[in-house]
């Protein structure tokens, strides 16, 4: 019987904690952001698979298109991944002729190749269409508001 009481007490306190947890708007927003991301990621991965890319490689191409000449560490920092993870992806992408490293001073700088740029140009319209479809439940104004709020949140992080 003591075990049963312990279980009931445990359930009760978990229930109370969950109630308090879900009353917190920041926690609810966090959970919802995670859920949306988890629903979009598989569709994005499937779309990219058709181009023989994965989401990490797409992020690398997209970032280098905007900021060519980054070091491997700068690129890893921009994409919030480890230098080792970045090295893995860059080796595969170099083998495919999508990126190349050029020595500049004591560091190697990363650049898109013509093939990398072509593949990104092919992927971008499909990526945009998929994201537009997944955000179709929001008006254009709501999308802009959400982007602004998330940008504000992103820039407030240490």
Feature locations, PLM:
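Helix-turn-helix DNA-binding elements, focusing on the entry/boundary residues of the two helices
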Residues: 72
């Amino acid at each position: 019987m003591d075990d049963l009481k312990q279980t009931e007490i445990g359930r009760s306190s978990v229930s109370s904690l969950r109630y308090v947890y879900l009353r917190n708007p920041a926690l609810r927003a966090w959970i919802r952001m995670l859920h949306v991301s988890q629903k979009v990621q598989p569709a994005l991965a499937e779309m990219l698979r058709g181009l023989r890319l994965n989401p990490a490689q797409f992020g690398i191409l997209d970032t280098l298109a905007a900021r060519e000449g980054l070091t491997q560490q700068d690129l890893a920092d921009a994409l919030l991944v480890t230098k080792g993870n970045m090295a893995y992806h860059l080796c595969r992408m170099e083998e495919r002729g999508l990126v190349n490293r050029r020595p500049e001073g004591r560091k190697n700088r990363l650049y898109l190749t013509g093939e990398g740029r072509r593949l990104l140009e092919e992927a971008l319209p499909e990526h945009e269409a998929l994201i537009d479809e997944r955000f179709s439940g929001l008006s254009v104004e709501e999308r802009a508001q959400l982007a602004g709020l998330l940008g504000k949140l992103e820039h407030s992080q240490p």
